[in-house]
Amino acid sequence: MAEPGFFNAMLIGALIFGYVLGSIPFGLILTRLAGLGDVRAIGSGNIGATNVLRTGNKKLAAATLILDALKGTAAALIAAHFGQNAAIAAGFGAFIGHLFPVWIGFKGGKGVATYLGVLIGLAWAGALVFAAAWIVTALLTRYSSPSALVASLIVPIALYSRGNQALAALFAIMTVIVFIKHRANISRLLNGTESKIGAKG
């Protein structure tokens, strides 16, 4: 049986590993490499896929979405070799790293793609629930933010109903953070000024 000190050090290491991986700002890197400048200067000022889509480059937005998700998936799967607790710590670290990346002044994305990536790494069936909820809401509303909020709200409920209380607790915490990061979007939705999916600028 592992000593408590070693176990705690392993969890801290997994958390730091996840954070470093999650803090890579792919949206910013890709838009600069494509000659589109600083994505933080347009739309919501966010570095995530939805804002990259506002540049009009759908392929770049898709690449950002995939890479931001893979950060979470990779962190969870690699750390899973040291047990589920390490995987949970690394996944949460990746999520926090995306939100608050050290490289760009701790001003990152809103975490939705990385949330999904962590979910794929820890409970792939939950990712299917997330995707279905997101797609249905997006088709009904044509807005990205409520789609993300509805999907992230359903996930911990689905996990809890399946008896996975540890993951349900993790994603409940992450869902609260996602809602906090979407405060401005919620305000714009209420005011009728939120941009629809694919809108430029």
Curated annotation (Swiss-Prot):
It is a multi-pass membrane protein. Pathway: Lipid metabolism; phospholipid metabolism. GO terms for biological process: phospholipid biosynthetic process. It catalyses: an acyl phosphate + sn-glycerol 3-phosphate = a 1-acyl-sn-glycero-3-phosphate + phosphate. GO terms for molecular function: acyl-phosphate glycerol-3-phosphate acyltransferase activity. GO terms for cellular component: plasma membrane. SMART domains: G3P_acyltransf (SM01207). Keywords: Cell inner membrane, Cell membrane, Lipid biosynthesis, Lipid metabolism, Membrane, Phospholipid biosynthesis, Phospholipid metabolism, Transferase, Transmembrane, Transmembrane helix. The keyword Cell inner membrane applies. It is found in: Cell inner membrane. The chain crosses the membrane at residues 10-30, 60-80, 86-106, 116-136, 166-186. Its EC number is 2.3.1.275. The keyword Calcium does not apply. It comes from the Bacteria. Catalyzes the transfer of an acyl group from acyl-phosphate (acyl-PO(4)) to glycerol-3-phosphate (G3P) to form lysophosphatidic acid (LPA). This enzyme utilizes acyl-phosphate as fatty acyl donor, but not acyl-CoA or acyl-ACP. Probably interacts with PlsX. Belongs to the PlsY family. HAMAP family: PlsY. This is Glycerol-3-phosphate acyltransferase. The lineage of its organism: Bacteria, Pseudomonadati, Pseudomonadota, Alphaproteobacteria, Hyphomicrobiales.
